[in-house]
């Protein structure tokens, strides 16, 4: 299927690793001009070199694939503004915005402080809102845009010992669902992609933390976790990138306001 997005420009937040990188790779494979944004400049440059070697600058024509490395702290207003401005300067107006961010610290709901609640919004809501605010007006004016947020299965099935994440991501989901209805007439879609247990560094860190907390081994934790997944395995990052690219595509123009699960059947609710 031709996804119809070759030559479009995407800013992919926190894309120097994990799920953000998986989405960036999937978009690059479709000929999208991709801004690799993160705090690790050297890593961002490595990824750009990798993508250019794989797909070649302009391999989809004069308006085709390219990539740029942008060092920015997207938890700050200055970092957000810089990332948006540099993406536009180097690659053109932003057609696709992929919202993503670092996972907050683990912790139980019963022991959350007011500072923890504030941190959930500072990390998982305010930066994403700021990015949307910078990019959305141009999308509406051009009457084409895709906003995709990388969420968590905790949005629909709160995860144990991740109270800050569950709180902040649920708030973001509410904002995005509301926004989707407001901008649909402008041909801008807004969606959320919910990963289950995808084999990323973040998931491994959480498994290590669980093993330490319970006094067992990483292997035992992962075996136990796999048993809760109907597919009986963790997903591969590329298996997350593929549906992400589709939700950012031209054929997905009638899909908006959804929270799509990519979880191997992990979430049991309807």
Spell out what each predicted region is.
Residues 9, 16-18:
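Conserved glycine-rich cofactor-binding loop
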Residues 137, 181-182, 253:
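Alpha-helical segment proximal to the catalytic Tyr-Lys
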Residues 184, 189, 255-257:
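Short, small/polar-rich loop/turn modules that mediate ligand/substrate recognition or access, typified
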Residues 32-47:
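Conserved glycine-rich Rossmann-like NAD(P)H-binding loop of the short-chain dehydrogenase/reductase
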Residues 110, 157-163, 232, 250:
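Active-site loop immediately N-terminal to the catalytic Tyr-X3-Lys motif
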Residues 103-105, 110-132, 144, 148, ...:
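Catalytic Tyr-X3-Lys loop
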Residues 148-172, 176-185, 197-198:
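Catalytic loop of short-chain dehydrogenase/reductase
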Residues 157, 245, 256-270:
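Short C-terminal tail/terminal secondary-structure segment
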